[in-house]
């Protein structure tokens, strides 16, 4: 059950944490059935922002270059693909271009992660150097994405790799990492504009949300944006809330210095045959930053080892096979090729 009172409270809380305004151009490409996208669209409408609806998710990057949005709700997989694409382009550039890019990236990381993220005053020399590399290098990277004037880019829905999060901030895009559920009307916590944040956290609670960590380490919620329950499901409702009225999220986490850190989805934990628990999301996120990997599912339940089912990025893999003179009749034959498997195994070893 999601009530209008919950929506009103969510709009008030989010407006203070991530203040979009009437000058923003918000592009929507996630399904509106997804409470994250719907809530972000409502927030934009509530302040008079311009909404740009992209009806073809696969063409989102082209749409961004055409419409130049200042804001967009996205899932981590979108930014993982951006990260991989930019790195690939840089690796194929000249030595001079590559050195310039990585120097600019390091300056951006130092300024935006080591100082701004921690709420520290940026030294004048670093600020001047950042303005120079931002204008000459980083702005060109953002232009390729259609993000010449980035404002707020909330990201949630899955585990965000710290490597990807640092990269996005380093090129000058304000990624707002958050955490939420349908039952909480999306946002529970997020990085707050103008406040310090920690890479790897999912931010601070929005106004009105009370977070409690149970003795078992589960994240428990109470507040005006939390569902009153499930429609006509008395048994489920009795299990969904504790005696103090806190909602069971099913996610494990902890609080540190006012920020929430996720550990894993409790129900998604695997237990190997030797008794070790494995959190698949972190392993999957680590693998997904590789350009050869499109999708991955970690498998470990009741096995002595951790395995992964990988769907390759076939356009990249097929190009690599041609460059390495590997003949194949179809994708199945390509995946079974010994040299392909050796190459993938080496890349996975490097990622670990």
Where in this protein do the model-derived segments appear?
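Adenylate-forming
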Residues: 4-8, 14, 82-86, 153, 226, 259-288, 317-338, ...
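Hydrophobic alpha-helical segments in the ANL/AMP-binding
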Residues: 35-49, 164-166, 170-171, 187-191
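Conserved A3 ("GATE") glycine/threonine-rich loop of ANL adenylate-forming enzymes
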Residues: 77, 156-164, 177-192, 206-208, ...
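Conserved AMP-binding/adenylation subdomain of ANL enzymes
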Residues: 6-25, 32-139, 149
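C-terminal boundary motif of the adenylate-forming
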Residues: 252, 290-315
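Conserved ATP-binding/catalytic segment of the ANL
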Residues: 205-272, 289
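Active-site loops of AMP-binding adenylate-forming
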Residues: 159-160, 169-174, 181-200, 233-236, ...
